[in-house]
Amino acid sequence: MENPKVSIVLPTYNRIEWLVKSIESVRKQTYQNWELFVIDDISSDGTDSKMLEFCDIDSRIKYFKLPVTEEVGISKFLNFGINNGSGKYIARLDDDDKWIDCDKLKKQVEFMEKNPDYVLIGGGIIVIDSNERELFRYLENETDEQIRKKALLSNPFTHPAVLFRRDSAIKIGGYKVLEFAEDWDFFLRLGNVGKMYNIPEYVAHYLMAGQNISIKNQRELAKNLFGIIKAHKNNYPNYWKGYLINVFQLLHSYLPAFFRTNSTTFLRYIKRKYF
């Protein structure tokens, strides 16, 4: 098997303590042929000086300052990595996530090299709080058939778990500039040009802390998802189920605070059990 390079894209902003953990999780990978693009939205917490230290000790780490704007959002960072990386594959990390499987890249690259008709591979994640205590964990649908069946019901991949073919990402035009769910739309478009798979193993920690989305943004997210689901209705099954789920989520955002808090878990249960 060849030893193709993986370009890892890691956007960051004022999270130096978590960023260090993310970078160290990359450096612990048994698969060594990688380059890491840390793309900084002009942090003010000492990120630049710490990154210079990392660049001095590991030439595979590259640091860029690239201010983002509301008009282009995080898509600007992600497309910068795709367009400027030299790897055959692209992997993703956010500055508050980290890989927990030291063989994550090795396993995913081996699968992709053996299966050239696949364009995207992910894995399971463990969701943690700011004290790194486990909140819950989940494995995504594994096979291409299973993924496609539920691709319009919920996002079939999580960013810190994925690896995809760079040429396929360029072929579909990279990430679209969307206010929300640009990753979900990107994964669905990748699925239009090849097969998808999820390793049935936990490969990453995903931080859930201080990320509560405002009610206004919940409603905007739901409205955005209507457009994404509709755009892919002819490429994936269960369009009306996905549409109905999103209607429920939009209506849920209009409930009084007490009912929203006490119905969220129930809604998640219904979604997983019946959809």
Language model regions located:
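A conserved acidic beta->alpha catalytic loop
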Residues: 32, 40-50, 68, 94
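Glycine-rich, basic loop-to-helix element that forms the pyrophosphate-binding segment
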Residues: 67-85, 95, 107
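Short aromatic/hydrophobic "clamp" motif used to bind/position activated sugar donors
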Residues: 90
